Amino acid sequence: MALEKSLETGDGQEKVRKQTAVYVYEAPLRLWHWVTALSIVVLGVTGYFIGAPLPTMPGEAMDNYLMGYIRFAHFAAGYVLAIGFLGRVYWAFVGNHHARELFLVPVHRKAWWKELWHEVRWYLFLEKVPKKYIGHNPLGQLAMFCFFVIGAVFMSVTGFALYAEGLGQGSWADRLFGWVIPLFGQSQDVHTWHHLGMWYLVVFVMIHVYLAAREDIVSRQSLISTMVGGWRMFKDDRPD
């Protein structure tokens, strides 16, 4: 919610409202963000080449193992993404209340929808003055849940289902994700949806990076530096 609705009420409310810096993101959350960002880049690049392999190279296989290294990097980054996501879910329970914003979208609150519409208008250059937010703004929160949370879960489930084919029947991946391929119909269908999911996340990353840079420049609070140092820096002391 907007800054004035995010702060506690009381005698010291006005003083708190005028703070120009608030500690928002704890170290584990920031570490997760950048590790996840790196893993998504690795997954995107290696996944593209897995979907469109390089031309066959003549000679001994041991001397031409590039695709093998690419697949290994893809699998390793997939583990990092999945394990990191589980750690992020854990931190939502033990971290501060900002750590829960990624998973708990307050769609039941009328004020949230009002501010969501304000953010849509702001991003479309129809609002002259943006609001101040300590955590995610409503549009950012909704986008993170719809694109990242749902996208990461989908890619992890379909990815490990395909990984299970290589590990074989009876493997841990087959026992946990063997139901996915029959659900989609066949292995190729899962490959196709997994490939489309990659582009889904690529589009999200492009929009996310653009809007983060845009907000850092034209909004009333820091964004990129907040995910580095944890502190949200405000450019003015007005509460709204």
UniProtKB/Swiss-Prot annotation:
Its main subcellular localisation, reduced to a broad class, is: membrane
Mind telling me which InterPro entries this protein's record contains?
Cyt_b561_bac/Ni-Hgenase, Di-haem_cyt_TM, Hydrogenase_cytochrome, Ni-dep_Hydgase_cyt-B
Cell cycle among the record's keywords? no
Q: Which GO terms describe its biological process?
A: respiratory electron transport chain
This protein's GO CC annotations = plasma membrane
Single Gene Ontology MF annotation = iron ion binding
Q: Does the keyword S-adenosyl-L-methionine apply?
A: no
- State its location(s): Cell membrane
According to its record, how does it sit in the membrane? Multi-pass membrane protein
What's in the keyword line of the UniProt record?
Answer: Cell membrane, Electron transport, Heme, Iron, Membrane, Metal-binding, Transmembrane, Transmembrane helix, Transport
Query: So where does this one cross the membrane?
Result: 31-51, 75-95, 142-163, 196-213
PANTHER family the UniProt entry points to = NI/FE-HYDROGENASE 1 B-TYPE CYTOCHROME SUBUNIT, NI_FE-HYDROGENASE 1 B-TYPE CYTOCHROME SUBUNIT-RELATED
What protein family is recorded? Belongs to the HupC/HyaC/HydC family.
Described function:
Probable b-type cytochrome.
Name of this protein: Probable Ni/Fe-hydrogenase B-type cytochrome subunit
